[in-house]
Amino acid sequence: MRTGNAN
């Protein structure tokens, strides 16, 4: 699983 953000 990958977590994070994309701006």
Curated annotation (Swiss-Prot):
BP-aspect Gene Ontology terms: defense response to bacterium
Positions of post-translational N-formylmethionine modification: M1
Keywords in alphabetical order: Antibiotic, Antimicrobial, Formylation, Phosphoprotein, Plasmid
Aspartic acid 1-[(3-aminopropyl)(5'-adenosyl)phosphono]amide PTM positions: N7
PTM entry text: The peptide moiety allows entry into the bacterial cell, where it undergoes proteolytic cleavage to release the aspartyl adenylate analog, which is responsible for aspartyl-tRNA synthetase inhibition. Can be processed by the non-specific oligopeptidases PepA, PepB and PepN.
Biological role stated in the UniProt entry: Antibacterial peptide, active against enterobacteria including species of Klebsiella, Salmonella, Shigella, Yersinia and Proteus, and strains of E.coli. Inhibits protein translation by blocking aspartyl-tRNA synthetase function and inhibiting production of aminoacetylated tRNA-Asp.
Protein name: Microcin C7
Source lineage: Bacteria, Pseudomonadati, Pseudomonadota, Gammaproteobacteria, Enterobacterales
Annotated gene: mccA
